[in-house]
């Protein structure tokens, strides 16, 4: 029995396309050259001096999945409300030899990256929320 329908797969492909159309920033670079990106859904007309609130989304499931597209609808909706939606990549057990604590640490590092780059991104560092 297939858990996901063809429509589910089509939606995921569409969300991944929308994700790739957003501004992407390298938030983590490894010694082997691999990079992890963070995609930001900015509010329409966003300017760096705006200091917008933001939500940092963590995708995945059971530390295995790599479902970057899961939060695209939420990020799009929030951007229309004046809130930036940020979807960072991070390593999961499905693709890397990492443990759940490694993944949690990367989540903390992603939050620290957003907080440390808030002025550059036009975000308010006091209004960064985490969801996932």
Language model segments and positions:
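Catalytic nucleophile-loop/oxyanion-hole region of alpha/beta-hydrolase
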Residues: 66-74, 88-125
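N-terminal cap/lid segment of alpha/beta-hydrolase-fold proteins
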Residues: 2-50
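Phosphate-coordination loops involved in phosphoryl transfer and adenosine-cofactor binding
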Residues: 51-52, 125-127
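Gly/Ala-rich beta-loop-alpha elbow adjacent to hydrolase catalytic centers
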Residues: 131-132
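Generic structural signal for alpha-helix termini and adjacent loop/cap motifs
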Residues: 44-45, 61, 117-118
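A fold-wide structural signal in alpha/beta-hydrolase
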Residues: 54, 79-89
């Amino acid at each position: 029995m297939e858990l996901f329908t063809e429509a589910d797969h089509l939606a995921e492909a569409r969300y991944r396309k929308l994700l790739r159309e957003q501004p992407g920033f390298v938030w983590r670079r490894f010694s082997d050259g691999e990079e992890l990106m963070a995609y930001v859904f900015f509010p329409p007309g966003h300017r760096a001096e705006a200091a917008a609130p933001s939500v940092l989304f963590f995708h995945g499931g059971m530390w295995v999945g790599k479902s970057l597209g899961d939060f695209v609808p939420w990020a799009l909706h929030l951007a229309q409300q004046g809130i930036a939606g940020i979807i960072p990549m991070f390593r999961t057990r499905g693709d890397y030899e990492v443990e759940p604590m490694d993944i949690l640490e990367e989540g903390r590092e992603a939050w620290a990256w957003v907080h440390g780059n808030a002025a550059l991104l036009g975000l308010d560092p006091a209004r960064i929320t985490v969801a996932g």
